[in-house]
Amino acid sequence: MMYRYVKDAWKNPKDSYVRELMWERAPKWRRDPVIKRIERPTRIDRARALGYRAKPGYIVVRTRVRRGSQRKTRFKAGRRPTRMGVKKITTAKSIKRIAEERVARKYPNMEVLNSYWVWEDGKYKFYEVILVDPNHLAIKNDPKIYWICVKQHRGRVFRGLISEGKKNRGLRNRGKGAEKVR
């Protein structure tokens, strides 16, 4: 029942109590390491909707990624500015997917389950990534999540098999005309 109030507050975070909370938290988050394991999710409603459970084998990691398009260096060799390929270069991967992959590299024994947006400022976006340990007995014995222990689910995030990866690859669209998206 209480999750509903949390969910409503996070729908418009700048118009609710979340703004004051983040006013205190955001400066600390900027000083924290880029990838930091946290005790419990900031958005418990979102985390649980995406599969998080408060039990052994699950961890939540907060990560910070740059905002905006790709940063490319301007080289010294001569050519027209148009042909330099510095401005307006965007990656095929979303910022969220980049965040998930970085976390997965930091925790090689874990599998990424999903992630969600937490906050953003002028320079960074903050995401919380839910990780699952496929070798943990609590996970192996849980009928809801034991599928992640099977070998074909190793490195799912790098193969674009989680939610954001499927979205980036245009797999949300089905039927005739979907070829144009991919």
Swiss-Prot record:
It comes from the Archaea. One of its GO terms (cellular component) is cytosolic large ribosomal subunit. The keyword rRNA-binding does not apply. This is Large ribosomal subunit protein eL15. Belongs to the eukaryotic ribosomal protein eL15 family. GO terms for biological process: cytoplasmic translation. The gene is rpl15e. InterPro entries: Rbsml_eL15_core_dom_sf, Ribosomal_eL15, Ribosomal_eL15_arc, Ribosomal_eL15_CS, Ribosomal_uL23/eL15/eS24_sf. It comes from Methanothermobacter thermautotrophicus (strain ATCC 29096 / DSM 1053 / JCM 10044 / NBRC 100330 / Delta H).
